[in-house]
Amino acid sequence: MTAEPTRLWPEEIRLSKGKESLFVKFDNGYETTLSAELLRVESPSAEVQGHGVGQKTTPAGKAKVTISALEPVGNYAIRISFSDGHDTGLFSWNILYDYGQRQQQLLVDYLERLAAAGGSRH
């Protein structure tokens, strides 16, 4: 995990026109665009991450998933609902920042897990 500022606050959160990505600009000037697919397969929900070590799942067939809704959760996160019905992940500002910093490696890791499981993005 990369070093994070003590306090993160999004100045702007914008859903792309086709709902296939989420743009976030933080108050420290950092900007990132995260694909709906990456957010879905790395959802911080227990459904995806599991309840303990070694329980993480590898959702297949998410290449065309889109974001159907964004809902603020207090002043620290958003709940993202996806076109496949998944809506249990709370994405804190720290998680969104971290995913932005590590998105290339997260995608590589996901594709490796998917291949090992015999799954497909489509």
Predicted segments, located by residue:
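Motif-centric detector for short Cys/His coordination patterns
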Residues: 1-122
